[in-house]
């Protein structure tokens, strides 16, 4: 019989977990890859520099970053009256070679190599929509064919074995408070390129059943999820140390990662890994060389992190202030600013990864092999 999954205590002392450093982490170095400071877009009050980088993806050798420019989670105007996010295309040297303004707050960004375009979701809390961006061309707006049944917005996007999967973020914003069994946690998106609409169907719901993945007495038990904050998602690579080939959803405030085996098939199965801290984006290095690119929303920069990576390790942007139990004044004691961490895929414990170079508060993350 399924039961609700209560917090699994992985670390007895949270502060001790925060202080721990991943072995070999001192070999990692950060450097500034790009900044929005010298890139401008037009607003009702004139030209202003773009700001608040968030999601990040790559296509055709270039890197694409969504700058939210202070727009609110339902598309509300920034303090300067701006209503648009800006997606910027950077070349390998960090030079801006293209940009597109999108109406609303861009929260999700991913490449669709099959069509050679970038997909962007708009407004994480409500009044959501979507854009397809053609490199060297225009951004085309798409509306959802029906109101989202999760009564919220949309966030991260993954292309998983040909399926476009989108997180149903901020469930219950315009309806009953989450969790609700009828609220989709992840949507399958189907595009009508003639009508410029997207049909959204549930992949699984906020109260779907899953198997506990953490090592310990509860491992293997079936539980009912109670997701309140579906956020980032990923296609777990085949070389990952665990959950290889799965689709993964991060429920940020709930401190959980949901792994879906056989996503989209008739007999898909879910596993839940409880984390010691909340996380945003996750990346799995493919080998010791390459680079991890991460946005820093607080510093308006994109950083490049290099070093000797462990193949298949699970790196994450750790976001203590986004936990459901975070204090209203944050950062604060026990709730530091964002940091780069490594997740133990068996226990869910997170250790801090030490960096030399400029301080980084990671958010969106992307690993690129050489």
Functional labels for PLM-detected ranges:
Residues 1-9:
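Bacterial N-terminal signal peptides that target proteins for export
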Residues 4, 18-19:
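A detector of low-complexity, intrinsically disordered, Ser/Thr/Gly/Pro/Ala-rich segments
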Residues 25-370:
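Sequence/structural signature of beta-propeller domains
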Residues 9-18:
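Bacterial N-terminal signal peptides
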Residues 20-24:
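Sec/Tat signal peptide C-region and signal peptidase I cleavage site
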């Amino acid at each position: 019989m399924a039961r609700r999954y209560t917090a699994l205590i992985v670390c007895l002392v949270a502060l001790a977990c925060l202080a721990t450093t991943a072995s070999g982490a001192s070999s990692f170095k950060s450097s500034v890859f790009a900044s929005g400071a010298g890139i401008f877009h037009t607003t009702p009050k004139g030209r202003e520099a773009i700001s608040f980088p968030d999601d990040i993806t790559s296509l055709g050798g270039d890197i694409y970053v969504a700058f939210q420019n202070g727009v609110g989670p339902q598309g509300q105007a920034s303090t300067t009256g701006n209503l648009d996010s800006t997606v910027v295309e950077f070349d390998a040297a960090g030079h801006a070679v293209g940009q597109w303004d999108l109406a609303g707050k861009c929260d999700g960004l991913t490449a669709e190599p099959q069509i050679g375009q970038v997909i962007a979701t708009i407004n994480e809390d409500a009044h959501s929509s979507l854009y397809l961006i053609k490199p060297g061309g225009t951004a085309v707006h798409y509306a959802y064919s029906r109101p989202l049944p999760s009564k919220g917005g949309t966030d991260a996007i993954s292309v998983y074995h040909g399926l476009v999967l989108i997180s149903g973020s901020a469930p219950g914003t315009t309806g009953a408070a989450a969790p609700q069994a009828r609220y989709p946690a992840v949507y399958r998106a189907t595009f009508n390129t003639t009508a410029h609409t997207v049909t959204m169907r549930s992949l699984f719901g906020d109260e779907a059943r899953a198997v506990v993945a953490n090592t310990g007495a509860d491992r293997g038990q079936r539980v009912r999820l109670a997701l309140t904050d579906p956020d980032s998602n990923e296609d777990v690579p085949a070389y990952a140390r665990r959950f290889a080939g799965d689709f993964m959803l991060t429920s940020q405030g709930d401190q959980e990662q949901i792994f879906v085996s056989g996503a989209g098939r008739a007999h898909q199965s879910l596993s839940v890994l409880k984390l010691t801290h909340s996380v945003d984006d996750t990346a799995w290095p493919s080998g010791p060389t390459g680079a991890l690119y991460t946005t820093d929303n607080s510093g308006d920069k994109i950083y490049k992190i290099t070093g000797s990576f462990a193949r298949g390790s699970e790196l994450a942007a750790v976001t203590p202030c986004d936990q459901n139990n975070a204090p209203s004044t944050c950062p604060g004691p026990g709730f530091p600013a964002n940091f780069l961490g490594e997740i133990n895929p068996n226990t869910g414990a997170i250790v801090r990864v030490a960096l030399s170079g400029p301080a980084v508060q990671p958010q969106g993350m992307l690993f690129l092999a050489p």
